[in-house]
Amino acid sequence: MKQRTWPCRSEGSRFSSLSFLKPHDKDKRSRISSINKATAKSTTSSRSSSSSSSSRPPSNEFGDFSMLPYDILMKIAAPFSHPNLQAASLVCKSWRDALKPLRESMLLIRWGKKYKHGRGGVRANLDKALDSFLKGAMRGSTLAMVDAGLVYWERGEKEKAVNLYRRASELGDAVGQCNLGIAYLQVQPSNPKEAMKWLKQSAENGYVRAQYQLALCLHHGRVVQTNLLEATKWYLKAAEGGYVRAMYNISLCYSVGEGLPQNRKLARKWMKRAADHGHSKAQFEHGLALFSEGEMLKSVLYLELAERGGEAAATPVKEVVHQQLSATFGGQAVHHAIHQANNWRPLPVTR
């Protein structure tokens, strides 16, 4: 929205007039002149004082970010992404010094990921990856806590993973909150109350994976009572946030009117969006819909993609479409569709 700046309003009268003096009123004229000079001098002095005070830096009367206790500082800055951390470190020297441990943790996370995935000329070594993540976690980074928790979880050391997820969650990390919620569902014995608490907190913090997981629990009555209205609300939020599985599920809900009014147009919209983001079942469903409408060329593209994505049911339908295309347009149409599928790339998805 374009902002508008209104003109400044005069502090004086709307109208002004010159004083009317007779030529012989010299004493009066002299008095007025001296008053005007004094007023002007006073105004200039006041403006100068105001300008100098506004140019001075604000006092440190209330302290600043770097003066906060370390545990509070970590609660604020621990979830910072690398770009945000770098930007905050450029504010002033005291901020740069205060955030030094977190900047070190970012470097450790980078090395940890190299060791975990064998990237950047480094041979994969899970022990070294975990060591780097733990060192980053010791410096207060919630990102490192989550990464270390993932390694422990993959190793089957679930209690250690849960402890790290909980530390990250209490510092406000949405990914840690989501992982903690899912962990409480999967550990033995499970803890549904804590699981829903952390999933909802993560979802409210805007993490789309948590929004989708929360919707699944509410939709299928998993660990909580079924609530279709709430489920579709969270499916829609996750879908709008770019989570492809939520796009597919909200399409199905619109298609059958589950949890919200039936709306075929919105169902088609979300099914196509899921298909364009690479969801193989959505590609199959969308391909079938196009086939039923006689859109053979478009249909065969989505059916080809669905088959490549592992949807076995797409194969017989695709063969029927191939036969009809060949009979109508010749074999060139089929080759064109396959060429399109070879060059097709999914739209980016939110993990």
Curated annotation (Swiss-Prot):
InterPro entries, alphabetized: F-box-like_dom_sf, F-box_dom, F-box_motif, Sel1-like, TPR-like_helical_dom_sf
Region entry Disordered, spans: 1-60
Keyword tRNA processing annotated: no
The TPR repeat ranges on this chain: 142-175
Keyword Protease: no
Mapped Sel1-like repeat ranges: 105-141
Superkingdom classification of source: Eukaryota
Compositionally biased residues, Low complexity: 42-59
Bias (Polar residues) ranges: 32-41
F-box domain boundaries: 62-111
Entry-linked PROSITE patterns: TPR_REGION
A Pfam match: F-box
Record keywords: TPR repeat
Protein name: F-box protein At1g70590
Organism: Arabidopsis thaliana (Mouse-ear cress)
Species classification: Eukaryota, Viridiplantae, Streptophyta, Embryophyta, Tracheophyta
